[in-house]
Amino acid sequence: MFWWNILIWLGLWNFLPVLAQDFKPKVSFHSDVDTHGRLSILGFDDSRVVLKLLRGVELYRSEDNGVTWDSVGLPLSSDNKPQEWNHLVLDRIYKADVAYLSGENGVLATGDKGKSWKQLTFLDADNHKIDFSDYSNVGDENRKPIINVEIESHPTNKNARIINIYELGKLDGKFTLRQISFYSKDGNNFKLASSGSKSNDDSNPLNMFCSFVQKSSKSKLYKLKDKVICQESTVLSPFGDVSSKLYITDVNFKSLSPFAEQLQDLSPASTFISDNHLFILTLSDRFNENSAANLWRLEDDSTDKFEQISLGTQIRKSLMDVNEIDGRAIITIYHRERNKDGDNNDDEDKSPFEDIFSGSIEALISDSYGKNFRHLSFDEQKASSLTLSTSIFVKKTMFATWTNTMRDFGFFDFRSKVSFDLGNTWSKLKVSDPEGKWNYNCDINSDSNDCGFQMFIVYGGGVEGDSDIFSPGIIAAIGDVYEENPSGDFLKMGTFISRDDGSTWEKVLDFPSRVVMGDYGNIILAVPFDPESDKDPQSEFYFSLDQGKTFQEYQLDKSFYPTELLPSALDGSGNSFMLVGTIMSEDYQNLESVSYVVDFSDAFKGASCKTSDMEDWYYSNGQCVDGTILKFRRRKQDAQCLIKTTYKDLTFEEELCGCSELDYECADDFSIDSAGKCVPDFSKASLMEKCESKKSIQLEPKKISKTTKCKRPQNIIKEEISCAAVPAPSNVKVTENKFSSIFKSYQYFDTFVRESILFRTDKSEAYVSHDGGQNIKQIQTGGEDILEINFNPFFNSSAYLFGKNKNLFATHDYGLSFKVTELPAGRQLGFPLSFHAKDIQTFIYYGGESCESFFDPNCHAVAYITRDGGASFEKLLEGASNCEFLESAVESPRVENGIVCMVKDKSTGARSYVSSTDYFKTQTVLYSDILGFMSTGGYIVVAVSHGERQLRAYLTIDGVEYSEAVLPADLDSYEQKAFTVLGSQEGAIFMHMTTNLDKNEEFGALLKSNTEGTSFVILERAVNRNSFGFVDFEKIQGLEGIILINTVANAKEIVESKDKTSQKKLKTKITFNDGADWTYIKPPSVDSEGKKYNCNPKNLEKCSLNLHGFTERKDVRDTYSSGSAIGYMFALGNVGEYLTPVSEASTFMTNDGGISWSEVKKGSYQWEYGDHGSVLVLVKDNEPTDTVSYSINGGKTWKDYQFASEKINVYDLVTVPRDSAMRFLVIGSSVNVRGEETRTYTLDFVDMFSRQCQYSKDDLKDFEYISLSHPNTKECLFGHKAKYLRKKSDDCYVGMAPLEDKFRIFANCSCTRNDYECDYNFMRVSDGTCKLIDGLKPADPKDICSKDNSLIEYFEPTGYRKIALSTCNGGLMLANSDSPHPCPGKEKEFKEKYKVNHTSFLAIWIFAVLIFTGMLSFIYYRGIKRNGGFARFGEIRLGDDDLIEENNTDRAVNTVLRNGVFLFSNVYTGLQYFGHQVGNFFKRGLSRFGNTTGPSYQSLLHDQFLDDADDLLVGHDEDADDLASFIENEGNFEIGNDEEVDLSSDTPTHAPYSDNPEEANPHEST
């Protein structure tokens, strides 16, 4: 009997699995045709009711999980037509019975599971009903006003609802998205939420977005549980104010009151609300939505007090999201950037998929208090996309899936890891294959590699999209298994199952599927995405009744793409499912929508599980988590039953644990270090406050977690903290970083958008920071050394890192992410890339062929071009070492695809200059022997060898026509051995031609070209340069025509010195009119200590301010001035006759463009400008220091700030190139026992100001226009009166305020002498005039005709030409003579212009004679004859009133008559006087011959009478003096100055100081 029973039980045991394998679920089918893909399905919680919306018009309802359907009537429109609805959504809180239909017509709502629907009513602020079907505000009926609707319900007040609508409208003729918010107290009638405020611009409407503070019944924000927060902002417009206003009200919306008032001046941008935390993001710049932002958290038990949260990284508006897990805030920051600066062009050909995956993502998680954040460092590499999957039931588990690249559509390269301790530690997802069924390309059993399950989509387990579905420890996912080389094809992925909450995974299906779970994971339904995954065209689904251990196939008779797979019970407790799919035609047109209801209620013959079928499952293998051990009851895997507790939430049991280290977090004043230890965080303000006036303090380094339930708390020992290391409370924030290597190079990306900077060290490592150096991270290159970094000057978000192994690391998002491409074979030569100005994907790379050794004669450079961003390279030209795209070099190239290159011949070593328009399939040699070429300011300048050891310069402005740079003829005596192109501005090139090349005695002539860049004149003759060709020449940024140079005062002595022992004596000169006039710099009256200088400042020749220039700079990027801090300059120098060594220098400053200077510090300092000059920072140079000096009031006062605990040697003080940020980076080093250590200190001055400056075009508010012109110009410079916009308030910062009118021309002026400079072959002499150089001739005036074919005339040279910058009109015309000549070949046009019509001329002349004769006749008869004729003519006296005047005509005639008599009298007297003087002349001559000793009585009396009388009529003409001077100096083409120059005046003048060694008195001036 015993054995018989055993056989019976064995038979039954073998039979039961057969029953499960033979089971087929009940399947119901339904089809809908002509849906055009518009099908929406919705199920209610804890209910069998399902809704279906077809074609946006027809609504159906099912009460049996979708087996049968009934039509539901919906409200009609006002004209009794069906309304169209776009979205069918379930209420987020009341999922059991409330749903909504929304569309362009408004919103419908149901409260009875879809049986009946009511149209919601919307009212404006004046209680007028809003009709959303009215499209008049859009202007195009094809574009609907409502784009999206978001509906919120209050978790404890069902009738309180908020609806936020995204509405399409028009703004300035463009379609604009606008947010409007409505509230309801009864759930049916909604009124517009409005603060009553208006935008500054009435044409720019306001956005409003409102939200309940209490998001769920679990919310811990108790004091705000019945409150609503609204955010109001203007609809964005270019350069507008992007900040918001925050309001708070209750659920009844009685009134809106300001919220978070302490943040209102800090530009609130976004609000993030979760169950435990309320965060507000504020912008550092209200005018820049991409500016760095700060995060603020509502303090515990407060309603309106916020504390700032430090994240350790930069965050940006609209690129940040906040979620919550187990009371901890998770912040994801998506750094996705495209070139949007004004000087960039978006890449229109860029793949949209590449753009989506082109950024990078950071993720951070807070402690349980939401205060201290740490990075979720799940991988060394930067992620370009990231999915964090967490469970709402077991919250400690996190799955991270990220991608680094997406190469093409359909190619996926992703990685995954799992954490069971909230991101503290991460591990790979282990793969199990106990039966060895699957082949993988890596070793899944090894713990030493990264071979694991790479998760793409996750299902079940209460994770992400299935967050309400709970299956204890049972999770399904789509993904692949690999270590390095993914298959890249989505359809080659598999479906995997885990039964231990993600610790291990097993493949169950060899294709990707949609997966849904029921009966708490005991039923798993999977539908392949591809119907042909099983090699037949029909669709099928697979199901498992043993938690994924085995699957059975169920074949369907249709072929479709599965769009939705829904459970009947939203909590995963049910046993039926709905599968929805779409049948497509071959051309991807939607033909039919199908739905299947799959019912498993009869599985296992309807058996329900008993206690013996259940098992205990412990989360995290029974480890204590948050003070508890979690235990769930779940069905045994092979049990032949279903739990069948439909609509019942599964619960778990908790067992409390004793407190351990895992239940504690770092205290508020501490942060966790790399070793996991809590260390004092000296950057926190709270620690600074506690340490104030104390030597040391004792604090507990840890605090117990807010979410733990552990018992028996540990005794935390306090730690003593020395306050010496804590900086004193200050508005300057300091962040220190230490490196064991030395920075060899560093450079910011030139942009307003970010403060991103790249570093390269002496260990060939590369680092990046996106917050001005506060957080510096190493760029992962796979261990490859970085040899060089190139920045793209045309696309300021792009940079390229050259790897030693010939990899090129490219970034197009300011260093947030890098893509790796391989460089062409051959040796890297270190030549910079050549970029295309209009195509970010196109650049030229230079590699070396046959260069095993650089001394190999066969070693030569080769230029390669890429047009796909480096993905592939083509050989462009052999021997080319420098190329330029014409579209990058000149403004208006005359050819397309033009490229010019310098090519070196391998055999002769000669360099040639070649061009091509077909990527060098054909080429043209333009010059066969050159030294090199460069581009500057729209010109290309080519240095061509000329004769023996001489050069000639050729220029082009279109890339086709080249002209020789014609230098002044008096320089012909000098060999043109070296010249330096100093740049171009406003249509003129500045160039330095070296006239003395002796070592340490170099100097030369400063030249300036005409607009064409072909004809040069000398500005100064002895301008200093060094042996490297650098010149002491600097144009002041942001101001017109101001240049500083250093001249060699003893140039003649140096040239004539035979032993070459003379030292250069340098003096600084400044010009305010682009080089036309130069003067020494007037020194300040006293030094920084209030003492007078030891020289007389009235004598500028002996006492002027001399500055160290470009030739002495350690970093050529350190300029005197800044383009954003208008008028400000710093310089090192001294007051005296000559420039002294830099060791004796002081630091000087000007804020008016160089007119007046002051000494700010003794000794030499480095300087930087911040926030357009709002912040000025100095740091000691050439000696150890721990202190910076700063000024926030334009240099009026200075304060010292100690930024380091010990003195360091400062290498550099840097900030963003545009000097617009308020963060400064100090780079230095200190020496310790381990050697030299690099240290960086980021000084943040953003808290130094209480607010951001206010500005608008109509009201300057915190700004003013100032004139920075030299006083002697009477505000007219370059022919106009210009003013500059500058901040006038010291308590605010500028940021990116839209200062588009920062330079404004108020009026044009008449031309004066200051608007002209000397023409070719003319030179300025000591009296300020332009004189033809002896022995030379003016330029042939006809040459201008050959350069401009549109001209028909030319003028004889006058010795003057108009300064290119001048916009003057009228006034003194010096450039053209009065006699024009026709251009050769343009005689006909010339005559046409100046021809005279003889017939017309004769007619006009006759008409004028007749008029004149008639007038004389009328005056004679009416005036002279009527009053007695000519007889009385001699009796008339001015002022007599005895003439006949009977009417107005008589009075007019007599007035003319009186004036005529007066004129005749004066002319007659003048003739008499002239005759008298002539007579006297002859009489004096005769008297000399006659030897008379005294005058005759006739002469004496007659002369005295006439002199006394005629003095009343004849004045002294001062112009006669000028005329005499012009005649005496007729060869000089002299024009007198407009103003006299007073050399004794304290005011520096524009009068020139000549340094011509040949002049006897070089400093004479008129």
Curated annotation (Swiss-Prot):
It is found in: Golgi apparatus, trans-Golgi network membrane; Prevacuolar compartment membrane. InterPro entries: Sortilin_C (IPR031777), Sortilin_N (IPR031778), VPS10 (IPR006581), VPS10-sortilin (IPR050310), WD40/YVTN_repeat-like_dom_sf (IPR015943). PANTHER family: SORTILIN RELATED, SORTILIN-RELATED RECEPTOR. Its main location: Golgi. The chain crosses the membrane at residues 1401-1421. It is a single-pass type I membrane protein. Residues 1534-1566 are annotated as: Disordered. The gene is VPS10. It holds the Pfam family Sortilin_C. Residues 1422-1566 are cytoplasmic. This is Vacuolar protein sorting/targeting protein 10. The keyword Nucleus does not apply. GO terms for biological process: Golgi to endosome transport; Golgi to vacuole transport; protein targeting to vacuole. Belongs to the VPS10-related sortilin family. The lineage of its organism: Eukaryota, Fungi, Dikarya, Ascomycota, Saccharomycotina. BNR repeats lie at residues 60-70, 418-428, 496-507, 542-552, 767-776, 864-875, 1148-1158, 1190-1199. Residues 1-20 form the signal peptide. Residues 21-1400 are lumenal. One of its GO terms (cellular component) is Golgi apparatus. Glycans are attached at residues 796, 1308, 1397.
